[in-house]
Amino acid sequence: MSKDLNPEKALIFRIVHRDNIEPMLVDGCHCRATMKGVKYTEIGNPELIQKRTDKAVPIDPGGTLSDYVPFYFTPYSPMLYNIKTGYNGIKQRPMRDIAILVSSLHRLAKLKVPFVFTDRHAYLKLAQFSDDLADLNWIIWPTLQARDFTKDDIDKFEKYQAEALVYRHVPIAALLGIVCYDEGAMAEIEAAAAKAGAKVKVKAERRWFL
């Protein structure tokens, strides 16, 4: 997988709780701003999730970070590490309860799904935003390939968490696949996809889960 993290493929990855998979297979992924009152199992930092509602996106289509569905450019993220270990006060969860959605910026562009991306964690003041695929050289691809998110260099740590932000909604057609922890989880997701009539590849890949 590490070699596949490059600008030519521009793969993007979203970590979700498996409880959210079934409705997502029916209607895709919606941004937080449009999901008020909808049952959804959050897995990130609750304080940061709330703060993102006030962080403006400085380029079109605008809005705030909560108007976007966030992805990373790697499945091996600090967020997943925190969920796995319970680090920094994040609720610890078994990896079998987690699924990773896979898409790509090229796929989104082909489907004309609006998106922007950043050079580092989108909430940070220094974050740069772009919707131009020519700016994918902002992403520190060799560091992502090395799975190096140690905090020996803060700039590196921030840039490791660069985000792809999909405006409002990610349709099922934009997904290249769903990766889960084991064969049992894969069977359950495949059954849910069949029930929803969603044509999406499902794969068990334990190595993705750190």
Roles of regions detected by a PLM:
Residues 1-73, 77-210:
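Active-site-proximal loop/hinge segments that shape catalytic or ion-binding/gating pockets
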